[in-house]
């Protein structure tokens, strides 16, 4: 009797797994079809627009090169000036909080 229960358990797991795979594949097919229809002209972005890289967004025509910061080791733009943390806090918070 115990063998039959394990066989039924295995069979039901296979059936349930097959059903799950079928629904997953159907969902993927529907998503792929929606993507293809959108790129054909449904919700497409203008063809003449070219996205700008990060450097072009920052300064317009000026090129920005990124160099490692000698103190922290993180990369930062080369032409940025160093600012003191206390000065930045005073600028951002204003006189109300800096009394």
UniProtKB/Swiss-Prot annotation:
- One family name in Pfam for this protein: LEA_3a
Give start-end of the signal peptide.
Answer: none
Q: Give the start-end ranges of region Disordered.
A: 40-62
Give the induction text. By auxin, heat, ethylene and wounding.
List the keywords (alphabetical). Stress response
Q: Which domain of life does the protein's organism represent?
A: Eukaryota
The record's section on InterPro entries has: LEA_3a
A single Gene Ontology CC term:
mitochondrion
- Compositional bias annotation for Basic and acidic residues: 53-62
Tell me the GO BP annotations in alphabetical order: response to stress
Protein's UniProt name = Indole-3-acetic acid-induced protein ARG2
**Organism source for this protein?**
Vigna radiata var. radiata
